[in-house]
């Protein structure tokens, strides 16, 4: 019987030890579970924060695209406004010249003087906006700037020289707008 009692005491002792181990394990598991839940909640908050940031960034990008599109449309729509404002005095001068030419006491010289002034005004506006005239009389023919309307033999000029300009060309900011239309020596 004493063996039984010893066995019983050992079993009780083992059961108590197992209970303590089981309770410690349970407490450790609870602590780990609590830590994991806290980490999960933190990750959820971070994910929500990142989602909000991404949505705000997306909205900002959409607003930027819309503003940029509107700015480009406005720039295209009003790109010539400064140029037109500079040309208005030229137009006014032409109109005054036309009105003056219909008067009885007007002379050809006064009309010519008015036309010369208006022409100079117009050229000044063009120069202000970097529009240059291409007037190549006496220069070597350049197919990048000139358009040969015809070629004629000319003993007075070297071959490929511009003899006459039918229509002057124009360059805007070093870019050809219209080639000079010319007669070239053969």
UniProtKB/Swiss-Prot annotation:
Key words of the record? Chaperone, Cytoplasm, Stress response
Which PROSITE patterns does the UniProt entry name for this protein?
GRPE
Q: Origin organism of this chain?
A: Hydrogenovibrio crunogenus (strain DSM 25203 / XCL-2)
Q: Where is the composition biased (Basic and acidic residues)?
A: 1-13, 23-34
Indicate the transmembrane segments per the record. Answer: none
**Could you tell me where this protein is found in the cell?**
Cytoplasm
Does the keyword section mention Electron transport? no
Is Cytoplasm one of the keywords? yes
Under HAMAP family, the record lists:
GrpE (MF_01151)
Q: What is this protein called?
A: Protein GrpE
Question: Matching NCBIfam families, A to Z?
Answer: PRK14139.1, PRK14140.1, PRK14150.1
